[in-house]
Amino acid sequence: ILPFNKDDMNKVPLDEYGKDKLASEMYLKEEYRKNGFPATIVMPGQISGPGWTIINPWGNTSMRVIQDIADGKEIALPNFGMEIIHHVHGYDVAQVFMNAITHRNVSLGESFDAEAENSITLYGYAKHLYEFFGHEPKIKFLGWNEWCKYEGNKEECEHTYYHIIRSGTFSIEKEKRLLEYKPKYTNLETIDLAIQSYIDRGLISVKR
C-alpha cells in the first residue's frame, strides 16, 4: 500500500543495515513507552545537495552514469526504470530534526519521514539530467542480470538493488500536521544543486 505507513512496524528488512535500523526504532519506542525516554525517530530519504554524494539514476553513487549523460552518451537503466528514489536536501532533513525539538510535545515517541514533497523514477531522473546538460535523452532498458553485467561493479550493483527493491512513495502529511514541516527544496531543485556542485568541484566535466 502506497504511500508507505511510517508507523507500521512490520517492515521486514532485507539486509543487516535495515534490520539494525528497525531494531533501533523498536528499542527507542519501547523505551519511550516504558520509561519515558525522550525518543523521536527521523527517517530521511537520500540526503542530497551541494557537497553530498548523490544517488544517481542507477540508484547507486557511481560517477560514470552522470558523466555519460553529461557527454550526451546513451545509458541503460535496470528493468523499465520505474523504480522510485527519494532525494531530500540536507537543509530539510535538519528542519525535521529542529521542528521535532521545538514541537516536543507532539514529537516524542513518534516516527517521522524527512522527505521532499515528491519522488522520482530512475527514468524520470535520467531524462531530467539529460535536459540539465542540454542533451536529448538516450535511454535503453536492460533486465536485472544483464544490467548488472553492463554496470560492471558488483558492489555498486548491490547498492542499486537495496535502493530500488522496495520502491515506493512517502507522505509528509504527518510531518506538516504535527511539526509544521515545510520543505524548502523540491527533489528536482536538490538534484540540480547536487549536480552543479559536482561540476563546480571538478567531479563531472562539461564540454563548453
Named regions from a protein language model:
Residues 99-159, 201, 205-208:
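Mid/C-terminal beta-alpha module of Rossmann-like enzyme folds, strongest
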Residues 90, 148-182:
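Conserved C-terminal active-site "lid" loop/helix of NAD(P)H-dependent oxidoreductases
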Residues 185-208:
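Amphipathic terminal alpha-helices
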Residues 9-41:
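Active-site Tyr-X1-5-Lys
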Residues 35, 49-64, 100-112, 135:
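Glycine/proline-rich active-site loop of Rossmann-fold NAD(P)-dependent oxidoreductases
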Residues 86-93, 186:
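A conserved structural motif in NAD(P)-dependent oxidoreductases
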